Amino acid sequence: MEKTYGKTVLPLSRVKRIIKQDEDVHYCSNASALLISVATELFVEKLATEAYQLAKLQKRKGIRYRDVEDVVRKDDQFEFLSDLFSI
């Protein structure tokens, strides 16, 4: 996917709405929302890439729930997600 400065897949208005659901947040600038959106996209890309690598090892073309679960279990950087899975 080609990266363009200032563009994200996630709509900034929705990102800002999610951020503002935190009652401690009174204001969110467009730059902050953009940064959070880009970070979210990078996070999802990393998690999906790792899960896809596991699927490829099993000679599959698609990612399954179990692949994501295995990434969360095996990779310390995703440990904070372990409560979301039956690990």
Swiss-Prot record:
Q: Which CDD domains does the UniProt record give?
A: HFD_Dpb3-like
Query: Which coarse location class applies to the principal site listed for this UniProt protein?
Result: nucleus
Biological process (GO) annotations?
CMG complex assembly; DNA replication-dependent chromatin assembly; DNA strand elongation involved in mitotic DNA replication; DNA-templated DNA replication; heterochromatin formation; mitotic DNA replication initiation
For the keyword Kinase, the answer is no
Location(s) in or outside the cell: Nucleus
Q: Which GO terms describe its molecular function?
A: nucleosome binding; protein heterodimerization activity
Q: Note the SUPFAM superfamilies from the entry.
A: Histone-fold
Keyword list, A-Z:
DNA replication, Nucleus, Transcription, Transcription regulation
Indicate whether Magnesium appears among the record's keywords: no
Describe the inactivation phenotype. Displays partial loss of silencing in otr region as well as significant loss of silencing in mating-type and telomere. Decreases H3K9 methylation more than 50%, whereas histone acetylation at the pericentromeric region is significantly increased. Results in partial dissociation of swi6 from heterochromatin.
- Record-level GO cellular component terms: epsilon DNA polymerase complex; nuclear replication fork; nucleus
**Known function:** As accessory component of the DNA polymerase epsilon (DNA polymerase II) participates in chromosomal DNA replication. It is required during synthesis of the leading and lagging DNA strands at the replication fork and binds at/or near replication origins and moves along DNA with the replication fork. It has 3'-5' proofreading exonuclease activity that correct errors arising during DNA replication. It is also involved in DNA synthesis during DNA repair.
Q: How does it assemble?
A: DNA polymerase epsilon is a heterotetramer consisting of cdc20/Pol2, dpb2, dpb3, and dpb4. Also forms a heterodimer consisting dpb3 and dpb4. Interacts directly with cdc20/pol2 and dpb4.
- The protein's name in its UniProt record: DNA polymerase epsilon subunit C
Source organism of the structure: Schizosaccharomyces pombe (strain 972 / ATCC 24843)
Q: Which gene encodes it?
A: dpb3
